[in-house]
Amino acid sequence: MNALTAVQNNAVDSGQDYSGFTLIPSAQSPRLLELTFTEQTTNRFLEQVAEWPVQALEYKSFLRFRVGKILDDLCANQLQPLLLKTLLNRAEGALLINAVGIDDVAQADEMVKLATAVAHLIGRSNFDAMSGQYYARFVVKNVDNSDSYLRQPHRVMELHNDGTYVEEITDYVLMMKIDEQNMQGGNSLLLHLDDWEHLDHFFRHPLARRPMRFAAPPSKNVSKDVFHPVFDVDQQGRPVMRYIDQFVQPKDFEEGVWLSELSDAIETSKGILSVPVPVGKFLLINNLFWLHGRDRFTPHPDLRRELMRQRGYFAYATHHYQTHQ
C-alpha cells in the first residue's frame, strides 16, 4: 500500500492532551506539526531499548518494529494512530519531532533508535543502497567533491521528492540532524503541493503524465534506470509528485524545456517554508505531496553537519483506510 490514500476525517485535534508527548502547530505552517516526547518518555524508551545496539536493529529487522511498539506503549498507544493520521492527512502530512534530552552527537545511536522506532510505527524503511542499511548517515563539510548536490554546502539543494530513481515505493522521508558545528544557514526547505501556486499549470500539461527516465549517479549504488511520470494522482484525483531535477533525464527538446520551466516554478514559489532543525530533531513528511530541499550554508573551514535519513512505505491495518493500488 502507498500514500495514495483517503483517510476518514477523524484526525485528532492538535490541542488534545496526549500521554508521553505534546503536539502543537509549528511556527512556519499549520501543515507542519511539532511533536515532542517528554523527558520521562525519552528516558524510559532509552532504558527499555538499551539491550539492543544499533547493529542489532541492522541485522534483525523485526527489532525495528519491537522498538516502535515500546515507544507506542510508553505513549499509551496514542502515538501510532496520531502519526498515521497526520502523515496521511493531505492538509498536514508533516511532523518535526524531537525528544527532550536527545540533543548531542554523543547520542547518535540513541537518535537512530528513536527515529527507527517512529518510522516503524507507520511502515517500514527501505534498503538504502548508498549506505547498505535501512538508514543512511552522511556528512556535509566545507569542501565537497561528490557527484550530487546532497553534500554540497554552498548552494541550495533544490526541492525534490525522494525515491525517484528506485522501484520501491517511497511514501515517507525522515531526515534527522545528528551533528552541527560552525554552521550558519542550511535550513530545511519544504513545499506542500497545494501551496505551490503553479501546480495547476504544470499538472495539466500534456507532459505531466509522460513516463520519463530517472538515472542516479554512481554514489547512489543504483545501476538500473527507472521510468515514471513526474505527476500522478491519489484516490481522490489530487496531484502527487515523483520528481528530482538532478536525476530526471529528458529524452528530447520538449521534455528538457518543460522540466527546466518546472524547476524554475518550484524554486521561486512563495509557498516554500524555511525550517530550522536543531541537533536531535527530525522531519517526517509524506513524500508524495511534500517536496524538500536545503538552503545554502555560510562558508566556514570547519563547517560540519551530519544527517541521518530513512525513507520507506506506509503499512497499517487496511480496514481503517481505503487504499489506491
From Swiss-Prot:
Does Metal-binding appear among the keywords? yes
Which residues make up the binding site for Fe cation?
H160, D162, H292
Q: What SUPFAM superfamilies does its record include? A: Clavaminate synthase-like (SSF51197)
Q: Reaction(s) catalyzed by this protein?
A: glutarate + 2-oxoglutarate + O2 = (S)-2-hydroxyglutarate + succinate + CO2
Uppermost EC category:
oxidoreductase
Q: Name one GO biological process term.
A: L-lysine catabolic process
- Quick one: which pathway? Amino-acid degradation
Give the E.C. number(s).
1.14.11.64
CDD domains reported in the protein's UniProt record: CAS_like (cd00250)
Binding note for cofactor: Binds 1 Fe(2+) ion per subunit.
Q: Name one GO molecular function term.
A: glutarate dioxygenase activity
Summary of subunit composition and partner proteins: Homotetramer.
The family assignment reads: Belongs to the glutarate hydroxylase family.
Main function: Acts as an alpha-ketoglutarate-dependent dioxygenase catalyzing hydroxylation of glutarate (GA) to L-2-hydroxyglutarate (L2HG). Functions in a L-lysine degradation pathway that proceeds via cadaverine, glutarate and L-2-hydroxyglutarate.
UniProt name for this protein: Glutarate 2-hydroxylase
- Highest lineage ranks of the organism? Bacteria, Pseudomonadati, Pseudomonadota, Gammaproteobacteria, Enterobacterales
